């Protein structure tokens, strides 16, 4: 055996030992790794200097919108009722009937758990730009 062959054998043995040591360390601390991932999983897709990442685990109808007026929001429709609104109009059950909620939490829950935007009622398209309903919609945006 020459010296080069012995050096390669020693180097290969050291690499294999380091790999096995790392594998054992991961095996030994696996429960700590799982606990860390559960605790800090919400920060996985946060804004960072590396770019903007979108968390697709939660539905957000505003993810694909870049215009602030096009983003869906909950607005005070009447004195004590809330509705989902954007520049496209109000979320509605049918024409001229926006979906109304008694509190803000129910409105937010409806916006972010449905998974899709259904019927939209736009008073500006139906009654014209000068109507009171259209002015109310625009005042919320």
UniProtKB/Swiss-Prot annotation:
Its main location: virion. The chain crosses the membrane at residues 1-21. One of its GO terms (biological process) is membrane fusion involved in viral entry into host cell. Keywords: Disulfide bond, Fusion of virus membrane with host membrane, Late protein, Membrane, Signal-anchor, Transmembrane, Transmembrane helix, Viral envelope protein, Viral penetration into host cytoplasm, Virion, Virus entry into host cell. InterPro entries: Poxvirus_A28 (IPR007664). Belongs to the poxviridae A28 protein family. This is Envelope protein A28 homolog. The lineage of its organism: Viruses, Varidnaviria, Bamfordvirae, Nucleocytoviricota, Pokkesviricetes.
């Amino acid at each position: 055996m020459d010296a080069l062959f012995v050096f390669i054998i020693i180097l290969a043995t050291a690499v294999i030992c380091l790999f096995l040591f790392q594998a054992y360390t991961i095996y030994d601390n696996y429960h700590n790794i799982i606990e860390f991932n559960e605790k800090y999983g919400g920060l996985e897709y946060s804004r960072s200097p590396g770019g903007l990442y979108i968390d697709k685990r939660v539905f957000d109808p505003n993810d694909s919108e870049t215009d602030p007026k096009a983003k869906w929001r909950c607005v005070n429709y009447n004195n004590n009722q809330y509705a989902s609104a954007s520049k496209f109009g109000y979320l509605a059950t049918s024409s001229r009937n926006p979906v109304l909620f008694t509190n803000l939490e129910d409105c937010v829950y409806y916006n972010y758990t449905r998974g899709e935007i259904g019927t939209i009622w736009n008073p500006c398209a139906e009654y014209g730009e000068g109507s009171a309903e259209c002015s109310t919609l625009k005042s919320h945006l």
